[in-house]
């Protein structure tokens, strides 16, 4: 009985401290990264795909720390999925360069939430910004679920609508009528993530691979917009 009481008191204290820590967290999260050499291309700058992974990692850290991330959601058969991503870059971090990703949510609706990113070096020089739209789905039915209800309104406590992000609100990605098929890609093991579908950054990498390397000797990516319409899975053809 004495041992049980001690364990109960310990758990109670842990929960209280955890809630206190969450309540003291800022609305904007800041996370440090390094442009490691094996994540850089032949120009000695970070691969766009790896920068995208850093943005998603920052989003994951931010949401998990505040109680509405994948760690909690998976326990109730839910998860986050990326619906839209827009990134504008004035510069890409160079090899061995330290950089910071800031992230925050400026609004939340029933089925979608808007997440922002700011990428700087350690001295505050701004490399670029990002805007994204996320949905929450049931991992069994794959259908959207009520974000506010699932997060017990916790997400609403961390909204930051006043922090500047100069990127314009995402609009519908328009496609020309005369587009021609450039390549078909069969999805394989390394494309599939923890949600059992093609990872959102893998689409970006596949698109960038459509351009010859000579293109990247002359130009660099300054802006991209991508909309995720439906899930793809292993052995699907893109």
Model-identified regions with their sequence ranges:
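Hydrophobic, ordered structural segments
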Residues: 118-120, 134-139
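Hot-dog-fold acyl-thioester-processing enzymes
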Residues: 19-82, 127-131, 138-223
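Short non-domain terminal segments
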Residues: 1-2, 8-9, 31, 201, ...
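N-terminal amphipathic/basic-hydrophobic helices that include classical n-h-c signal peptides
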Residues: 1-21
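Short secondary-structure boundary segments
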Residues: 7, 62, 70-108, 196-199
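A subset of signal/propeptide-processing and intrinsically disordered low-complexity segments
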Residues: 9-12, 16, 116, 133, ...
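Hydrophobic transmembrane signal anchors and adjacent membrane-proximal interface regions, especially
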Residues: 3-5, 124, 221
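Hydrophobic beta-sheet segments that form the core/acyl-binding groove
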Residues: 85-123, 224-238
């Amino acid at each position: 009985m004495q041992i049980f009481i001690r364990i109960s008191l310990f758990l109670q204290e842990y929960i209280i401290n955890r809630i206190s820590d969450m309540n003291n967290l800022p609305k904007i999260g800041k996370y440090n990264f390094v442009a490691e050499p094996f994540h850089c291309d032949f120009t000695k700058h970070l691969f766009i795909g790896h920068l995208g992974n850093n943005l998603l990692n920052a989003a994951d850290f931010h949401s998990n720390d505040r109680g509405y991330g994948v760690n909690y959601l998976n326990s109730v058969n839910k998860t986050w999925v990326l619906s839209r991503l827009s990134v504008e870059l004035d510069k890409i971090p160079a090899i061995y360069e330290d950089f910071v990703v800031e992230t925050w949510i400026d609004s939340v609706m029933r089925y979608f939430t808007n997440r922002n990113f700011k990428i700087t070096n350690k001295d505050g020089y701004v490399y670029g910004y990002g805007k994204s739209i996320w949905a929450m789905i049931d991992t069994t039915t794959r259908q959207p679920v009520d974000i506010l209800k699932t997060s017990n309104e916790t997400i609403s406590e961390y909204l930051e609508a006043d922090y500047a992000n100069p990127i314009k609100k995402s609009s519908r990605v328009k496609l020309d009528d005369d587009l021609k098929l450039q390549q078909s890609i069969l999805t394989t093991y390394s494309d599939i993530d923890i949600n059992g579908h093609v990872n959102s950054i893998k689409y970006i990498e596949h698109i960038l691979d459509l351009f010859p390397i000579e293109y990247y000797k002359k130009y660099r990516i300054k802006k991209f917009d991508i909309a995720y319409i439906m899930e793809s899975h292993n052995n699907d053809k893109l």
